[in-house]
């Protein structure tokens, strides 16, 4: 679990909030440079990654090739996961995701820029709403 204040020459003011009764399994990686909110009573499976940023932008062609770790962080956007959610093993939750109370994120899903306002099952690559409860 990390709140990143500095990365290379970049400075950040991360806000990382973790509510009560969050159950973390093994090898969970949570990384915040902007805003990451995990509400109460969340079950997080093994090998889950939750991060509000990525390593660099790959949208623009650049003649300069450099190691990914040297690129400035990009794609920065808040993440919020509501109360009583269950995140399955190997799920990846990326920038811009807003998951409401009572949702289940299926194992091996990749959630990016998904905004959900009703309790539901979310799954797939890229993740989408599979079933509303």
For the regions a language model picked out, list residue spans one by one.
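Flexible, glycine/small-residue-enriched loop-and-beta-strand segment within the central core
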Residues: 1-93, 125-126, 133
């Amino acid at each position: 679990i990390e709140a990143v204040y500095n990365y290379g020459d970049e400075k950040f003011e991360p806000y990382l909030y973790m509510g009560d009764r969050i159950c973390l399994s093994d090898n969970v990686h949570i990384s915040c440079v902007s805003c990451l909110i995990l509400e109460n009573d969340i079950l997080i499976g093994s090998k889950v990654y939750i991060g509000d940023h990525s390593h660099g932008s790959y949208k623009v062609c650049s003649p300069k090739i450099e190691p990914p770790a040297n690129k400035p962080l990009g794609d920065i956007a808040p993440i919020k996961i509501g109360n009583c959610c269950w995140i399955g093993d190997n799920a990846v939750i990326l920038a811009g995701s807003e998951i409401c109370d009572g949702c289940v994120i299926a194992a091996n899903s990749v959630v990016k820029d998904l905004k959900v306002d009703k309790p539901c099952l979310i799954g797939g690559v890229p993740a989408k709403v599979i079933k509303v409860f």
